[in-house]
Amino acid sequence: MNLGKESEVLEFKESTSELHSAIESIASILNKHDYGEIYFGVYDNGEPKGQIVTDSTIKKISDSILRDIEPRIIPTITEISIEGKSIIKVSFSGKNKPYSAFGKFLVRVGTQNRHMTREELKKLFLDSDYSYP
């Protein structure tokens, strides 16, 4: 079962070895949208690869999200099975823009994360109702 294509609110990671990049994607997605999902154990083309899932794996993801994204968000992290392969699904939402990851302010453009311009960041800080175009 293919999970589809990556988008502005959906990202696939082959494993939790890409956790740093996933954290950046979460902040980036939230700076443009109010919600998103990251899947660990899925190829970029949406095909399931599988991921070893333990309590410490889930804790590592949760701890990084709580520690490295400001302001803090509380994600939903679940293990799902697709074609007999374990996948980690991280669902998140937040409306307290702007969000930073590792002290960097990023925004999602298509399937890529890019640094916000000074003007974009200024608008987000000054106008809490600002919605990225």
Feature names for model-found ranges:
Residues 1-133:
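Conserved N-terminal catalytic/coupling substructures associated with nucleotide/phosphate chemistry
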